[in-house]
């Protein structure tokens, strides 16, 4: 974990030096973002309302909060509702030949970024990436999509949205509660009641219940591992029975969550190593690991390692799960969003 993240989330002693130094920049960040929101509120800037409904999945802070599993969940849910979803993303970490860039079966994370490739490989859904989310969405609508799911983009106010889901890390929550760069927040806690649903990833009874806004709890369920080289799938219980120990790597926004998940499933992790989010893996990154011990990684990291993977490398797919009542609430809100555009 980087020092600044320790200051944000772990009450590191360096906070007494760094936070006062960074507070003036946070004040400037607040001023700029406030003026930007105000320009939309009073009509100086205008949001673009698309011809099809838009669902935005985002967060008010930085780092991995669990947005991608929810995007995957919404893709499957909207399909069950008879819709043809398309996903738009910034494509962070990728460099496409042009924008908006429509992914195909040959697209790589080098061009499109990590998450879009993961989503495409898992769901075979149309995906367009680019900083201009409106252009990306229009490209997908032209391809026949009748509902747009935006992976991130909560602060992209130029894109009007019909349903807004905010994801919160149920364990780390909001860190020290300060705006960037003194804290991890892009927007203050005032933003939560203005969204349609707040989803807490990982239960925190004290902080997510009895709020003055609609909120729910989700968990990330893992039942099997997938081999990077062969595609073989094996249940976690069977894998653990066959393997006493594993190594693990994670290059995501919150790598400790992945390591904790492995330990919760009773894996004995011998060596674990974290990398910065969106790290571009090369084979040399794995030199210190014993090839005789299985190496486990996230699905997001796996999309960048297929070209040089070894036979003992596995990734852990996870799925967002909700209670029946919360699932029905998501369905109801989605149907309302769709009907509001049709009318």
From Swiss-Prot:
Pathway: Glycolipid biosynthesis; lipid IV(A) biosynthesis; lipid IV(A) from (3R)-3-hydroxytetradecanoyl-[acyl-carrier-protein] and UDP-N-acetyl-alpha-D-glucosamine: step 6/6. ATP binds at residues 61-68. Keywords: ATP-binding, Kinase, Lipid A biosynthesis, Lipid biosynthesis, Lipid metabolism, Nucleotide-binding, Transferase. Disulfide bonds: none annotated. It catalyses: a lipid A disaccharide + ATP = a lipid IVA + ADP + H(+). One of its GO terms (cellular component) is plasma membrane. Its EC number is 2.7.1.130. One of its GO terms (biological process) is lipopolysaccharide core region biosynthetic process. One of its GO terms (molecular function) is ATP binding. It holds the Pfam family LpxK. Belongs to the LpxK family. Transfers the gamma-phosphate of ATP to the 4'-position of a tetraacyldisaccharide 1-phosphate intermediate (termed DS-1-P) to form tetraacyldisaccharide 1,4'-bis-phosphate (lipid IVA). This is Tetraacyldisaccharide 4'-kinase. It comes from Colwellia psychrerythraea (strain 34H / ATCC BAA-681) (Vibrio psychroerythus).
């Amino acid at each position: 974990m980087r020092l600044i993240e320790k200051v944000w989330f772990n009450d590191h002693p360096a906070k007494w030096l760094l936070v006062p130094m960074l507070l003036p920049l946070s004040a400037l960040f607040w001023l700029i973002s406030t003026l930007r929101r105000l320009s939309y509120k009073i009509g100086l800037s205008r949001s673009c309302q698309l011809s099809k409904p838009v669902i935005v999945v985002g967060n008010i802070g930085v780092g991995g909060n669990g947005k991608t599993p929810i995007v995957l969940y919404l893709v499957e849910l909207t399909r069950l509702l008879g819709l043809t979803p398309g996903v738009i993303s910034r494509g962070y970490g990728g460099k496409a030949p042009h924008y908006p860039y429509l992914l195909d079966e040959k697209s790589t994370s080098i061009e499109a970024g990590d998450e879009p490739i993961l989503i495409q490989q898992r769901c075979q859904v149309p995906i367009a990436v680019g900083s201009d989310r409106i252009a990306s969405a229009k490209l997908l609508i032209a391809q026949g999509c009748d509902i747009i799911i935006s992976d991130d983009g909560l602060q992209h106010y130029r894109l009007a949205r019909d349903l807004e889901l905010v994801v919160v890390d149920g364990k780390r929550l909001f860190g020290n509660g300060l705006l960037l760069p003194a804290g991890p927040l892009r927007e203050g806690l005032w933003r939560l009641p203005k969204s349609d649903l707040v989803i807490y990833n990982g239960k925190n009874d004290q902080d997510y219940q009895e709020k003055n806004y609609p909120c729910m709890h989700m968990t990330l369920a893992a039942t099997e591992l997938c081999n990077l080289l062969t595609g073989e799938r094996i249940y976690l219980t069977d894998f653990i029975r066959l393997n006493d120990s594993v190594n693990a790597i994670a290059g995501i926004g919150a790598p400790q969550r992945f390591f904790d998940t492995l330990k919760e499933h009773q894996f004995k992790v011998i060596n674990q190593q974290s990398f910065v989010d969106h790290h571009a893996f090369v084979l040399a990154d794995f030199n210190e690991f014993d090839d005789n011990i299985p190496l486990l990684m996230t699905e997001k990291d796996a999309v960048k390692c297929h070209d040089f993977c070894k036979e003992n490398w596995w990734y852990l797919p996870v799925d967002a799960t909700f209670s029946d009542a919360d699932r029905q609430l998501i369905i109801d809100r989605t149907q309302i969003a769709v009907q509001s555009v049709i009318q």
